[in-house]
Amino acid sequence: MPTSLIDNKESSNFLVGLAYKANDIWYDLVEILMQLPGGELIINYIKASHKNDPWRTLLEALLALFAIKYFLASRYSQDDKDNMVLSKKETDELIEDWVPEPVVVDLREDEKWQIETNPILNGAVSKRVDIQQGDSISTNVLNFASLDFLGMSTDKKVVENSVECIREVGVGACGPPNFYGTQSVHVRCREDLAMFLGAEDCIMYGQDFATPISVLPCFLKRGDIVIVDGGAYVGLQKAAMISRCNIEWFNHNDLDDLESILENLSKDLEQGPLNRRFIVTEGLSENFGDSPDLKRLVEIKNKYKFRLILDESNSIGTLGDNGRGLPEVYNIPRSEIEITIGSMARSFGSSGGFCAGDKDMIYHQILTSNAYVFSAALPPYCAVAVSTIIKAIIDEEVEGKVNPHIRPLKENSAYLHSLFNNSKELSKYVTVKSDSYSPSLHLRIDADLREALDLPDVYGGPGSAVTKALKNGNEELFFDQYYNLESFKLQTIINKCVEAKVLPTRTKRILHHEVLPIVPELILHINATHTKQDLDYAYSVVSKAIIDTLEHWRKTGN
């Protein structure tokens, strides 16, 4: 039946009335909104937005409705019918049957010696220490296992200032540097470090191992490239890996190999997208005890437009007339090294790490460095200890002369190296890998003897069994019997030395954490407080222990 004219008019009047009613409601809402703080700003925004793009107004209205529904709705949608209700007996049975995964894999029987032979020091770290290994206690032992190269951690002034700081502000910083962890002594220490190193600014970290792992990812990401020394210690290896950039490795301190890699990359880098490019190396190698030619290294990085990250953990306080590291040796300004990182737990006799360089580079880390943002700041007394040691070194500076705090270490390092290098009998068993200026004397089993003992040249590295285990996720269960055996023999040498009141040390590395090939080493860390008589005695004890142990091994194969 056709609709009448009267029905059409009634429908039209109803719709018109509805429209007027909606209009009145809208204006009432607008008036209410105008009375609210910021309401006029919202209304003007809606008018301008609707005028330029009506569809945008509709989209924003829908988003607003969705947001209201989202926040008012229940956070979780649950159906009680799907919940399983267990009786107490069933719950107890499940708990009893549950076997948790171990936090760490249990040690094998032939690995437990590593735990049992860890020396425990009774008292402060100094030239002579009392140590406990297992059930045995040795007193007044000559310490060649400490990285406190200058021997200043027990200096009277350092101890007094540290104690005074503890009494004033307590032991811990109680928070990250970015929040409430930074105190005045931290600021002074940063200034002292920057001034000592000749850098614009400096930043400090609570842990030295966390320093490279936090600094490198601040400046490297996917698509960037870093070329790392092939002898870098594990901290630099991990730092490069977690930054997720492209990594190239050049042969240890082989600058010809470095330049060859850069030359091969140069064409691709010119054509590819603009990215960040760094070279990473150490001022004094932790694994080899030698240094690169910094002058040529700077020339290479400038030629190929790369930046340089130099880890001076071992070279600060040991190299240069005043202990300012490798740049002081080559008379190169610190500004030529874009990023300098290092440890304060070695020559500075304290704890933590630092990064020095350009102010903008330092400021960038304040907001982007994981360790700086999330980890606790360095304990205040540790910062005071570093500042005190720096002041002591600077106060003794005389231009053109070796600093009195540095000279004994240099002389001791050269002397002990000469004793080991000049021994023809000892050279049949071990090879000195470190250079004479290194305060850490590195000894490796001689290549010919390794072959006679059926030991591999190196352990780990690309293509090795441990690398394959790592790819398969079985690295925790991997065991290298030769690596364990060689490390045990070095520990046997150490045990014999401890019986004679000398404490050397050895490399203690976890094989599956190392990306690069490694070789176990016996190490003597030389101290500025050691006397010539100490060094002579240590040489006689260590050399006898080496010859006795390795000769017995060679003859018996056991």
Predicted region positions:
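N-terminal "arm"/small-domain region of PLP-dependent enzymes with the aminotransferase-like
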Residues: 2-10, 14-20, 24-172, 306, ...
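PLP-dependent enzyme catalytic core of the Aspartate aminotransferase-like
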Residues: 3, 48-56, 60, 64, ...
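Conserved N-terminal alpha-helix of the aminotransferase class I/II PLP-enzyme fold
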Residues: 71, 159-207, 415
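Active-site phosphate-binding strand-loop segment of PLP-dependent enzymes
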Residues: 148, 248, 253-309
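Substrate-binding/gating loop at the entrance of the active-site cleft, primarily
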Residues: 207, 228-245
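Conserved PLP-anchoring active-site segment centered on the Schiff-base-forming lysine
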Residues: 216-234, 255, 259, 409
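Active-site C-terminal subdomain of aminotransferase-like
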Residues: 304-307, 314, 319-449
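Conserved PLP-binding catalytic core of the aspartate aminotransferase-like
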Residues: 401-417, 425-501, 513-533, 539
